[in-house]
Amino acid sequence: MFLDTSFIVALEMARDNHHNSAIVYWKKYIQKPMPLVTTDLVFAEMVTFFNARGLHAKAVEVGDRLLSSQLIDIVTITPELRAEAWSMFKRHSDKRYSLADCASFVVMRKRRISRALTFDDHFVQAGMNVAPAP
């Protein structure tokens, strides 16, 4: 399963609109954990999100947890993956996908990952299954 920024933020921020859904889903997930995949761009987005809101300690705490987790594979976006993500970004001028979204979609397709932990509607628009279900 793919781990997106929006799920991490919802899980960590009590004020987030999706916080309760994230907590309920996470409690079920940790009973039967499975490997998660994310990207270094998602990691950077998450760190930037917290730090930009004056939550440097939270950025470090969550970042350290992700980096040390045996269940989370943080994929480095190589020049080849970046080129594919950039190509996808350019093709979808009708969408509001971020480059990080496009990189996530490319990694998911290459790794045959069909489900994402996310609250970002862009994943549904791109044809991915999402959890928790919208």
Across the structure, where does each feature detected by a protein language model lie?
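Short acidic, glycine/proline-enriched helix-loop-strand junctions
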Residues: 66-78, 86, 92-94, 123-134
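A general alpha-helix detector
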Residues: 7-8, 45-46, 84
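Short glycine/serine- and small hydrophobic-enriched flexible loop segments
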Residues: 48-51, 109
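Acidic active-site catalytic centers that drive phospho-/nucleotidyl reactions
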Residues: 4, 45, 101, 120
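Active-site neighborhoods of divalent-metal-dependent phosphate/nucleic-acid chemistry enzymes
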Residues: 73-115
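Short, well-structured N-terminal submotif of metal-dependent ribonuclease cores
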Residues: 1-38, 51-63, 134
